[in-house]
Amino acid sequence: MSEFKVKTGLAQMLKGGVIMDVVTPEQAIIAERAGACAVMALERIPADMRKSGQVCRMSDPRMIKEIMEAVSIPVMAKVRIGHFVEAQILEELQVDYIDESEVLTPADWTHHIEKHNFKVPFVCGAKDLGEALRRINEGAAMIRTKGEAGTGDVSEAVKHITKIKAEIQQYKENLKTESDFAAKATELRVPVDLLKTTLSEGKLPVVNFAAGGVATPADAALLMQLGCEGVFVGSGIFKSSDPEKLACAIVEATTHYDNPAKLLQISSDLGDLMGGISIQSINEAGGKNGARLSEIGW
């Protein structure tokens, strides 16, 4: 079995689960108790990064290690786009997965990390099919929608998963000849075989999670019904008034996403949820609510 197959197999093991952002071992324990399939170790959640206006880098390895020691579920950590040395450090630390993330300040505005050079599986964000296939070609073992992290507004995540699905369907219908496939692969900057495999299967060849703006059980169920295979939850849980109850509810909603009666029960009495920031209040140049993080990446 190829090393890439091993890495994609590890990512498949998270399918149907919820991955939660945590900033302390105590939060990681809450996430594990609530049923999270993994945690993302961070010094600051995306909502706080967005407010700071500062350069956001890989978290302190000591903090990540403390979280790794506190829980038995897999631990992920983020690196800046293109910062392969941060990735080398996290691989040496033996994190379970690395997220090459647009939430952090990019280190390289031209190249993403060549992920085939690492044994640890990588997660990457994508807002359309071309981005997703370019990241997979670089070695990403899992794709997630970019959404708009730190907002509590799920609309961008919905847009991204919908676009990826629509493009797959459109290309399946319209690409008929070898020259059609070759032209589209050139346009997307991906190998033609990867494009053909994706269209033949009708889905990405790696697991595809939702991320960015998930704040409620209904948000999680919505994205699962739209075709996502699991959910990342960032700022939403620990910006709420009852994090453990909300965490449990989002895990349940991700499992029972097609059961309205169960979702009704899950969604009741959750306390005050994350206030959030509407996408319309954010512009690409930035401002008091930060810039559009989903536009970072190429």
From Swiss-Prot:
What triggers production of this protein? Answer: By the absence of external thiamine.
Enzyme Commission identifier(s): 4.3.3.6
Q: Which PANTHER family match?
A: PYRIDOXAL 5'-PHOSPHATE SYNTHASE SUBUNIT SNZ1-RELATED (PTHR31829:SF0)
Which residues are annotated as active site? K78
Q: Which family does it belong to?
A: Belongs to the PdxS/SNZ family.
Q: Which GO terms describe its biological process?
A: amino acid metabolic process; pyridoxal phosphate biosynthetic process; pyridoxine biosynthetic process; thiamine biosynthetic process; vitamin B6 biosynthetic process
Cross-referenced NCBIfam families? PRK04180.1 (NF003215), pyridoxal 5'-phosphate synthase lyase subunit PdxS (TIGR00343)
Q: Where does D-ribose 5-phosphate bind?
A: D21, G150, G213, G234, S235
Record bears the keyword Lyase: yes
Biological role stated in the UniProt entry: Catalyzes the formation of pyridoxal 5'-phosphate from ribose 5-phosphate (RBP), glyceraldehyde 3-phosphate (G3P) and ammonia. The ammonia is provided by a SNO isoform. Can also use ribulose 5-phosphate and dihydroxyacetone phosphate as substrates, resulting from enzyme-catalyzed isomerization of RBP and G3P, respectively.
Keyword terms: Lyase, Pyridoxal phosphate, Schiff base
PROSITE patterns attached here? PDXS_SNZ_1, PDXS_SNZ_2
Read off the InterPro entries from this record. Aldolase_TIM, PdxS/SNZ, PdxS/SNZ_N, RibuloseP-bd_barrel
A Pfam match: SOR_SNZ
Pathway note: Cofactor biosynthesis; pyridoxal 5'-phosphate biosynthesis
What name has this protein been given in UniProt?
Probable pyridoxal 5'-phosphate synthase subunit SNZ2
List the cysteine pairs that form cystine: none
Tell me one GO molecular function of this protein.
amine-lyase activity
Instruction: Provide the reaction this enzyme catalyses.
Output: aldehydo-D-ribose 5-phosphate + D-glyceraldehyde 3-phosphate + L-glutamine = pyridoxal 5'-phosphate + L-glutamate + phosphate + 3 H2O + H(+)
